[in-house]
A protein has these predicted regions:
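Terminal targeting signals and extreme-terminal segments of soluble enzymes
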Residues: 1-193
């Protein structure tokens, strides 16, 4: 199973009952002993778009109110407004009988919109001065051993040799501009929304 399939499995929601879901969070998407905020946002977006008639959040806001433990929690979806072109609602994440996080979103049907897609932009000139094979593979443990979450380590990151800061010697000119030119890749193809 590739990373995209694993993530889809990690945010999978089943059988809503009265607009409520019980979620057993996947610890592969934790920072320490608590779920990563982006992971929670993805689950809450999924809950909202599972209940509302529109499939994509076009505007959203998340409030992280209290710590979430590594145990099951409840998502409760409340509809605010439903019309032909958009709908909105709120998702409340509850654990230990208190609201820990809220996600408010307005949704629409972007898959029916027409317009530009996959616009190509040329790479900056710095990508032309070295071949990709010369780029330095990110060593997550050398940077912060044991700190980088597992879900970040799934990312294959190759950094331009001039920007691999962990390999610089003490004679490096620290007055240079901060830059990080890199290739970021993940197995599994183009992600969904």
């Amino acid at each position: 199973m590739n990373q995209f399939e694993r993530f889809q499995e990690a945010i999978k929601l089943e059988n809503p009952e009265n607009n409520k879901f019980i979620v057993n969070p996947d610890t592969n998407y934790f920072v320490g002993n608590t779920p990563h905020g982006g992971y929670l946002m993805a689950i809450m977006h999924k809950a909202l778009t599972s209940i509302l008639p529109h499939s994509t959040s076009i505007s959203s806001s998340v409030q992280y109110l209290d710590r979430i433990d590594a145990k099951p929690f409840e998502l409760e979806v409340e509809e605010f407004k439903i019309s032909s072109g958009s709908s909105s609602g709120i998702v409340k994440l509850k654990q230990n009988n208190k609201i820990c996080t809220t996600f408010t979103g307005t949704c629409s049907d972007f898959e029916h919109m027409k317009g530009y897609d996959y616009l190509e932009k040329t790479l900056p000139d710095i990508f032309k001065d070295r071949q990709k094979k010369d780029y330095v593979k990110m060593n997550y443990d050398k940077i912060s051993k044991g700190f980088t979450p597992a879900f970040i380590q799934q990312l294959q990151c190759s950094i331009h040799p001039d920007h691999a800061w962990w390999n610089r010697d003490s004679q490096f000119n620290h007055d240079n501009e901060a830059r990080c030119s890199a290739f970021l890749e993940m197995d599994g193809g183009v992600p969904d929304q």
